Amino acid sequence: MIERSNSTPSATPVRPPLAVDEEYNQAFRSKSFLDLWSHAHHHLTHTFSSFKLSTSTPCAGRGGAREDDFLHAGGDGGAADDSEQSCSYTVLDDFVLEPSPESLARGARLQQRRRRRPRRHRVETLLIEYFDVTEEACEACSALLAAIGAARRHHLTLRRLLLRLDGGDDDDAKDALARHVRLDNPLSPGSLSEFHDVHARCSPLASRLAAAQRRLRRLARALRIARGTAAAALVGACAAAIVAAVVLAAHALVGIGVAAAAFGATPAGAARWWARRAAEKVSSRHYARAGATLDAAARGAYIVGRDLDTVSRMVRRAHDELEHGRDVARIAMRGHGERPLLQEVAREEEECEEDLRAQLAELEEHVCLCLITINRTRRLVAHEMARGLPPPSPATVTTTSEERLTSS
């Protein structure tokens, strides 16, 4: 008889908690994103320093001491350091758009020289519009980064003036606060009109590119069907000519010569002429290359449009949060200096600052990713265009070298 063991079964090992933040950072902050982020911080660190020197005016009484503690000490556990790092990231001056507009214009000139009759097709018009829209999207993202820095400075000045108002400097602080609140919100739709215009153009452009790509696909299919039908008709014509020649050969030898001459002159000559003209005008390979380029452009426009959708929603949230802080400041400005009211305003502004700082930091990251996406999609479209181009002739290479030397 087997005795039952009295030892309790070993407990199931507890799984470690899922590190969502760590997984998110590994997937979100890629190498290209970190390179772009550190590059911007390295070149624009002086922005917050100059702003801090221009706004660090001495204040009398308890409000001045609290303001200095807020700006320099950072009583909430390193908030000042985070603000300094974030405020330095305002404009991305050194961002390089790929491919550059100059290289695109040079490629367009080379393509026109290869043609006998320079004429802009619908495909080229759509591709030019795609590159124009993505270039404007890059400029709009740079302007949005500047607006994010302006929003940080706006809210920081708002906190400073509220601290002065709480410190007893009623008249001057109230006047300065009234002037500051009357300023426009840096994230308002009027201040970011360029961004919203580009955002509105992405979705229709993606639809037009997709429609043009479907049209080219239908044309390529129709061309394949037409070529198959023409080949079948050609084979039938040749077979009929051979049968006619055999029938005529049974009656006279002269008929054989006539049939051979007719066969050599009419069906084969017509077939060679038709094939040569078709090869000159259009080919299924040409349609396939143009369709692949349009497909890459349509995908790129759709992806950029979706990224701008996300950024637009985040801009709206940050705008509402900043506007909430401005409304709270208006309430404090309309009050008569009651201590409980000012304490409640200070508490509300502190909560608003934490939420606004997190939202602006996340918005900056998404704008950086949007810039990287714009470059990646432009490179893919340019790569598809380069695959369809024939190798340049020596005369074209010589002309291009002369243009580069002249421009330099």
UniProtKB/Swiss-Prot annotation:
<keyword id="KW-1133">Transmembrane helix</keyword>
<comment type="similarity">
    <text>Belongs to the UPF0496 family.</text>
</comment>
<feature type="transmembrane region" description="Helical">
    <location>
        <begin position="252"/>
        <end position="272"/>
    </location>
</feature>
<feature type="transmembrane region" description="Helical">
    <location>
        <begin position="224"/>
        <end position="244"/>
    </location>
</feature>
<protein>
    <recommendedName>
        <fullName>Putative UPF0496 protein 2</fullName>
    </recommendedName>
</protein>
<keyword id="KW-0812">Transmembrane</keyword>
<dbReference type="Pfam" id="PF05055">
    <property type="entry name" value="DUF677"/>
</dbReference>
<feature type="region of interest" description="Disordered">
    <location>
        <begin position="385"/>
        <end position="408"/>
    </location>
</feature>
<dbReference type="InterPro" id="IPR007749">
    <property type="entry name" value="DUF677"/>
</dbReference>
<keyword id="KW-0472">Membrane</keyword>
<dbReference type="GO" id="GO:0016020">
    <property type="term" value="C:membrane"/>
</dbReference>
